[in-house]
Regions:
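Membrane-embedded alpha-helical segments of multi-pass membrane proteins
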Residues: 51-55, 107-112, 160, 164
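Short, amphipathic, aromatic/basic-enriched membrane-interface segments that mark the entry/exit
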Residues: 96-104
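Hydrophobic alpha-helical transmembrane segments
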Residues: 18, 128-130, 156-160
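Alpha-helical transmembrane segments of integral membrane proteins
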Residues: 81-89, 103-141
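N-terminal signal-anchor/first transmembrane helix of integral membrane proteins
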Residues: 1-70
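Juxtamembrane or sensor-core-proximal signal-transducing alpha helices
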Residues: 164-176
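Alpha-helical transmembrane segments and their interfaces in multipass membrane proteins
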Residues: 29-49, 99-100, 138-165
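A generic, lipid-embedded transmembrane alpha helix
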Residues: 27, 53-58, 82-93
Length: 176
């Protein structure tokens, strides 16, 4: 264990975190399949949702697997790109399905928020803000195309929630 006390820097901590992430993504996969079956996903919707799932799993793995507190530039680039493309794929899938219910897609959008919170805690505050802004713009542009009268409810709370965590993290990191 190193002197910094970073949970992910010690081997047992990494195994525990990896196990928790594996359980989370198995549960997310099961929930996505059940939601897709109930919502009668089309082949294109399945493809978009599967792409989002894979990209979010990659983003979380890269974010959580670094042995140091701060992520390297290439890791940050992978995470940012994966989260933005995943969010675009989720919103695009919802729009293509034309369903008024966004429920089947909420877990993926929530997972993107979780990835960004962990990303912020790994020393990438500014990039986390940029990704939140880009994801919010994607939701505002594509959200109306879903046909759901409550699409904005899926965009703004996540943006606010993520920004709250980022602001809190920034305050903690900048505090004396």
């Amino acid at each position: 264990m190193t002197g910094s006390g970073d949970f992910l820097e010690n081997l047992p901590g990494r195994w525990i975190a990896g196990g928790i992430l594996a359980i989370y993504f198995v549960a997310l996969g099961v929930r996505t399949v059940v939601n897709g079956r109930l919502a009668d996903f089309t082949a294109v919707t399945w493809a978009g949702t599967t792409l989002a799932f894979v990209l979010l799993a990659i983003a979380m793995t890269v974010t959580a697997s670094s042995a140091t507190s701060a992520l390297a530039d290439w890791q940050a680039g992978v995470v940012c790109g994966a989260v933005v493309i995943a969010v675009a794929a989720v919103w695009g899938s919802a729009a293509l399905l034309g369903s008024e219910a966004l429920g089947p897609f909420q877990t993926m959008l929530s997972t993107a928020t979780i990835v960004l919170v962990v990303f912020m805690m790994r020393g990438r505050l500014l990039l986390a803000w940029v990704v939140v802004a880009v994801n919010t713009v994607i939701g505002v542009i594509v959200g109306p195309l879903t046909g759901s009268p409550t699409w904005l409810n899926a965009v703004l709370p996540r943006a606010s929630f993520t920004m709250l965590f980022i602001a809190t993290g920034a305050a903690l990191l900048l505090a004396p």
